[in-house]
């Protein structure tokens, strides 16, 4: 009598493990988000300035690697502050600025015009 053995083939594992596939997708999504943030910042859609309600930094000058003189507008006064890495000192108090001398606020950029100018610059019309 002859014995025959049946061979059972094991399913082969996919080329990449599920952990590697998920990791690759996550890295791709993060790279896409960073690229979109860079484009938004580069094209000028990001909000300008870091003014807080009632508080606005109107001027700033660097005196050294960690020292600055800053003019801050608060309600009815302008404060001249000395800012270092470890402390902030009030140097002087100025009267409020006149509204006439305030710089005009630029209107928000129009996406269509910005895209046209970008395409013209790159040579694609």
From Swiss-Prot:
One of its GO terms (biological process) is archaeal or bacterial-type flagellum-dependent cell motility. The keyword Protease does not apply. Keywords: Bacterial flagellum, Cell membrane, Chemotaxis, Flagellar rotation, Membrane, Transmembrane, Transmembrane helix. The chain crosses the membrane at residues 20-40. It holds the Pfam family FliO. One of its GO terms (cellular component) is plasma membrane. It is found in: Cell membrane; Bacterial flagellum basal body. It is a single-pass membrane protein. InterPro entries: Flagellar_biosynth_FliO (IPR022781), FliO/MopB (IPR052205). Belongs to the FliO/MopB family. This is Flagellar protein FliO. It comes from Salmonella typhimurium (strain LT2 / SGSC1412 / ATCC 700720).
């Amino acid at each position: 009598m002859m014995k025959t053995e049946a061979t059972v083939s094991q399913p082969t594992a996919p080329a990449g493990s599920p952990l590697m596939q998920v990791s690759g997708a996550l890295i791709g999504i993060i790279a896409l988000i960073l690229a979109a943030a860079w484009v938004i910042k580069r094209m000028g859609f990001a909000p300008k300035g870091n003014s807080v309600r009632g508080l606005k930094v109107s001027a700033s000058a660097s005196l050294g690697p960690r020292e600055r003189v800053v003019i801050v507008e608060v309600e009815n006064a302008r404060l001249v502050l000395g800012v270092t890495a470890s402390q902030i000192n009030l140097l002087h108090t100025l009267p409020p600025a006149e509204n006439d001398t305030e710089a005009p606020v630029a209107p928000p950029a129009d996406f269509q015009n910005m895209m046209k100018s970008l395409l013209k610059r790159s040579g694609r019309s």
